[in-house]
Amino acid sequence: MQGAGSRGAWIHSPSHCPGNGHGSPPAVAPQRRRLTRRPGYMRSTASPGIGFLSPAVGMPRPISAGLTGQEFYPSQSKARQCSLDLRSHCQDSLVGNPFLKGSLGPAVTSVGHLHPAQGSMRERMVHSGVHSGNDRRQSERLTGDSGCRQEFLSSDSSKSLASSLDVAWSKGSRGLKTVRPLVSPASNGPVDIPSLPGFQDTFTSNFSFIRLSLGAAGERGEAEGCLPSREAEPLHQSPQEMAAEGSGSDRPHGEPRHLWTFSLHAAPGLVDLAQGTRSNRQPECGMVSSSDAGFSSQDASPAGGRSDQDGGWADAHGWHALLREWEPMLQDYLLSNRRQLEVTSLILKLQKLQEKAVEDGDYDMAETLRQRLEDLEQEKGRLPWALPSQQPALRSFLGYLATQTHAALHGAPQRAGSDDPEAPLEGQRRTTAQDSLPGLAVTRRDWLMREKEQLQKEIEALRARVSVLEAKEQRLSQELEDQEMLLRWQGCDQMALVAQLSPGQLQEVSKALGETLTSARWAPFRVEPPETLRSLRERTKSLDLAVRELTEQVCSGEKLCSSLRKRLADLDTRLPALLEAKMLALSGSCFSTAKELAEEIWAVSSEREGLEMFLGRLLALSSRNTRRLGSVKEDYLRCRQDLALQEAAHKTRVKANTVKCTEVLEGQLSCCRCPLLERVWKADLEACQLLMQSLEIQEAGSSSHVEDEKQVHSTGEAAQTAALAVPRTPHPEEEKSPLQVLCEWNTYSASLPHCAAGLWKEESHVVFAEVGDKCEAIGMRLLHLEDQLLGAMHGHDEALFQSLQGELQMVKETLQTMFLQLQPAKEAGGEASASYSTAGAQEAED
């Protein structure tokens, strides 16, 4: 019997042992597949397949059909026949069970050699139930109503067999090998069952090339359609595991309870090979029961993870929920990348179009495309390409998920390495590390927040400590300075001088010195203003500077507006003359001259429009600056008032302290006769007197300055009023108003119709020039009045302010009068020029 190359294992019995006279022929299938022979050093003395031993002759057989007592097999042939019947029964009972092929290999070896025609049945996966109901059904299959029902196993041993298969299925799918002892019922006496040599002796070698050869032989057998034999298993086991397994299987021959060993060690290659047939025969084998759905992804086998029927992942709804949550964000990331691609493609197309437009000379199109390209480049810069998984939010979530996975992986070996073989498997087995991760995260967050709060408290404490230390350092510096001053006078020994004083004098000098040192702390010579007063002075100074700048801007704007108005007046003067000359040229059929005049008229009109637009903008700017100047002036005046009040209060305090110090010094001088102290106090008294004089001078100077300003403003106002009241004696011709000049000119030009147009043109220029000069003089006068108004506001001179307002009102009335006089002159000039033009045209027709 060549068990080394066989896919199934024999049912070993004493009749199969060498030297036994009652040997029976093995139950070999009629179509046995020819296998590759192995070298001699790779063969074992017997079949290496691990199978459960058949009961020996004389083993008690319990009767299940209500019979009592025990029966014994009369001969080895009967035992052999029953073993064959048991093999056929196991084949029939296992055909309908969806056992995993990778886990079935060793188990089928222990049951019996299957017929080759039943290869499809053998390749089906074994389904092992987890709960007690599945255990009962499996035990009924293994100890059913066949010829050998409960002949070798009692009901307890069959349940143990089912439990061992369950444990082997749940742990063999994770690559673990489980050896379960199955105890037969007790007999009347000990049964001597000889152990098989092939069962215990498994070929092992310490040479690496031999182990590689064994692995290669197993792979060849697997490639030919046969499952690898048990000899290849030492390649996947350590020497310690093999020694433990050998010692566990080596039982005494006289033991009444015999071991039936099942090894469900499924190789990864077999599991992958089983997937091909399982995916095709899954409807026949049936679905995994709902009790098995409790296995998580780390508990499932690799083949089960790639199954088409059970979905591949536990808790698929949770994963779908995560996908629904992150799908919009992923789409946003991808949309950004897609948009970047579109922008890049569009840039290339527009660049080609731009080159073509440049070649064709269409520079307008090229400029448009250039602007569009710039916009696209900016958009491309705002769309940086990046992997969605590298985005901060998703990357953080993936890191958290990796932490959960790591904890779950650490929890799986703890469940798989349980040493209790009788512990029941539960349908839903979750790792506690995964459940405790959210709690750990919350705990970690709370700890971090507490640490941050603690650090903030420590920082505040350190800051307070630093402020205390700084104050202490200042105090120590002052004391150190005092000590240094004392050390400077240690060389001068005054003991001889002091020893000459009487006790009364010593007491008097000591008291005077104490008062002097005490009064030095509140000496009035610290006349520096407080911090609030200094800051208010700085603010007042900055506001004064702002007022000056804004005033300069307003004045320059007014000057520019005046220049623009003058230029506009010149253009308004030129336009009627040009129109008149154009009409004359047309009436005289001088079309070339008329064309030139029309072009000049168009240029003048364009310039006038531009100047008007610029003047409007300048007026708006000047108005805004004026409003801003008004607000800044208000702030400046308010600060000036506050500054004056605080300075007055400060001077009052200094003056009061000076008076108090003077009184104290005078009292000390009258009661102390120490020459040194008397001289010191006299110097202090003189200093106080000087300070009082300084304060009085400052008060007198401020009052005199205000009076001088008032006098200056009043003098300037009187001079300006006199200048306005007594104007210069004009020329007799200048005394005429523009309207009078226009009327005289109309009377004079009535007798000269032919040269009226030219004369009127010259006279209009003269009139407008005179009026413009007068307007400019009035404008300058207005600027001067504005400066005077600012000075009056700064000096708080209400009288000067009122007089200047009256003068401004008078100047405004003068301007209004001149404007009213100028309007009829313009209308009269326009009518005269029109009449002259009509007269010239009629004369030309005649």
UniProtKB/Swiss-Prot annotation:
Q: Does the record carry Ubl conjugation as a key word?
A: yes
Q: How does it assemble?
A: Interacts with NDEL1. Interacts with CCDC88A (via C-terminus); the interaction is direct. Interacts with GSK3B. Interacts with tubulin alpha, ACTN2, ANKHD1, ATF4, ATF5, CEP63, EIF3S3, MAP1A, NDEL1, PAFAH1B1, RANBP9, SPTBN4, SYNE1 and TRAF3IP1. Interaction with microtubules may be mediated in part by TRAF3IP1. Interacts (via C-terminal) with PCNT. Interacts with CHCHD6. Interacts with CCDC141. Interacts with FBXW7, the substrate-recognition component of a SCF (SKP1-CUL1-F-box protein) E3 ubiquitin-protein ligase complex; the interaction targets DISC1 for proteasomal degradation.
- Single GO BP term: neuron migration
Q: Where is the composition biased (Polar residues)?
A: 277-300
The protein's role, per its UniProt record? Involved in the regulation of multiple aspects of embryonic and adult neurogenesis. Required for neural progenitor proliferation in the ventrical/subventrical zone during embryonic brain development and in the adult dentate gyrus of the hippocampus. Participates in the Wnt-mediated neural progenitor proliferation as a positive regulator by modulating GSK3B activity and CTNNB1 abundance.
Which sequence ranges form a coiled-coil region, renumbered to this chain?
A: 440-489
Q: From the Swiss-Prot or TrEMBL record, give the protein name.
A: Disrupted in schizophrenia 1 homolog
Q: Name one GO molecular function term.
A: molecular adaptor activity
Region described as Interaction with TRAF3IP1: 289-686
Q: Where is this region: Disordered?
A: 1-53, 127-147, 231-257, 277-312, 409-436
Q: Where in the cell is it found?
A: Cytoplasm; Cytoplasm, Cytoskeleton; Mitochondrion; Cytoplasm, Cytoskeleton, Microtubule organizing center, Centrosome
Induction comment: Up-regulated during neurite outgrowth upon differentiation with NGF.
- Please list where the region (Interaction with PAFAH1B1) is annotated: 721-846
Q: Which gene encodes it?
A: Disc1
Please give the residue ranges the record annotates as the region Necessary and sufficient for interaction with PCNT and localization at the centrosome: 435-846
Q: Where is this region: Interaction with ATF4 and ATF5?
A: 588-846
Record bears the keyword Metal-binding: no
A single GO CC term, please?
synaptic vesicle
At the top level of its lineage, which domain of life is listed? Eukaryota
